């Protein structure tokens, strides 16, 4: 068992390496419905902030949106890991993401003594999007086109507001609701939003906190510790990646292809996994890099 001082000394070179760097953290999965898990994740994020890392949080809320829809008697439908979003579903998503989850995260940051600013992607035109094209889906052997409704495809990220907040020692917290060119709102997949924000900010790392230990093989028995983007793309092409993981893996691949040095997928339900990933030699989860 390592001594406490050894743990701290192991962290020192990583603290030095990441000081002043931007790290985008996507909060998702069970953390969005379990207050204890979420609070632990926020404590870790605030610790990163206090050791000089420029932290940006992007949160999802899929399980809580699904739960709210169920309570209102509305069924959730997914195509390729994306939620089909009619007008009523969009309003529910906005209520849950912006009105509840985002504000709750800001309160937790304040409780830890830091300053957070809650934003949706439509604030300051951070995320400009267009309505997603019809999606092809195979239904009982027949290919059909499905309209996902008010689901957006990101056209542009304007990082200027986020950079201003980071420069002034705030932690930006972003919910994945975008704006289109006509002032309308669009639901954006939070994994995709986090990846594109990381690219726009020229982040050093993108960390996706979810409900699984990392990227797994087809049998779901082995977690890949490291993957190149070539290996990760091959896993996607082979069908080994489950539907819900497709946007996560796709977003981290895109981030690395576009200048983010490292992307990670880790289990956010395990206490202090974020700290273990960043500040220990072994790390946790799956790391994806160019090679």
Swiss-Prot record:
Query: What positions are marked as the site Transition state stabilizer?
Result: 26, 248
Q: What class of enzyme is it?
A: transferase
Places the protein is found: Cytoplasm
Task: Look up the record and give one Gene Ontology term from the biological process aspect.
Answer: L-arginine biosynthetic process
SUPFAM superfamilies in alphabetical order: Carbamate kinase-like
Pathway given for this chain reads:
Amino-acid biosynthesis; L-arginine biosynthesis; N(2)-acetyl-L-ornithine from L-glutamate: step 2/4
Superkingdom of source: Archaea
Any single GO molecular-function term of the entry would be: acetylglutamate kinase activity
Q: Give the enzyme's EC designation.
A: 2.7.2.8
The record's keywords, sorted A to Z, are:
Amino-acid biosynthesis, Arginine biosynthesis, ATP-binding, Cytoplasm, Kinase, Nucleotide-binding, Transferase
**Which reaction is this enzyme known to catalyze?**
N-acetyl-L-glutamate + ATP = N-acetyl-L-glutamyl 5-phosphate + ADP
General function of this protein? Catalyzes the ATP-dependent phosphorylation of N-acetyl-L-glutamate.
Q: Which family does it belong to?
A: Belongs to the acetylglutamate kinase family. ArgB subfamily.
Protein's UniProt name: Acetylglutamate kinase
Encoding gene per record: argB
